[in-house]
Amino acid sequence: MIFSIEDDAPIVRDLLPDWRARFGEAGGRLELEIGCGHGGFALGFARAFPERALVGIEQRRKFAAELAAKGARHGLSNLLVLNGDARLLAPRLFAAGSLAAIHVHFPDPWWKRRHHRRRLVDDRMSALLLGLLAPGGVLDFRTDVERYAREAVVRLEEVGFRNAAGPGRFAEAAPDEIPSTRERRYLASGEPVWRLRLVKA
């Protein structure tokens, strides 16, 4: 399923989706992936954890459509793919404190200084992510750009996230970690991946 929304659409709390109706029992453990790309993580997650529901938001329509089609072909009823900007969609789709986890893998680092304001992990988005998570909920952030990772950990800790590895520190790969399509390439070549596992207290 592909979903889009106009940029100026109002936030109508009474119209928030009934995720339990959409996903059944899996809707009781709702997780979000921002930026699904080619869908390696989303597909792997949905297969590995059928008891959990994943909503993926991908801004590129082609990628979103392809991933949705793959999910349908594999009968992954616990996966829903939406097309749009997560900064606009997330507050219209999820109630505060409703997500068990949010996954942000390899977001665009926007290298040029004048483009830094386009980075996903800015002050406003960091606060939004914290607000959407339930107490004890986890933000799973990964990047191949060390500088971006170091800037992100400072900003995310400042808005109130607790760093499970310790202040300013990066996490090790979890035993049940599902790699994204892009991450597999880095792991195969031995290049480092910078991970954050941040918890809402």
Swiss-Prot record:
This is tRNA (guanine-N(7)-)-methyltransferase. Catalyzes the formation of N(7)-methylguanine at position 46 (m7G46) in tRNA. Substrate binds at residues 112, 144. One of its GO terms (molecular function) is tRNA (guanine(46)-N7)-methyltransferase activity. The active site is at 108. Pathway: tRNA modification; N(7)-methylguanine-tRNA biosynthesis. SUPFAM superfamilies: S-adenosyl-L-methionine-dependent methyltransferases.
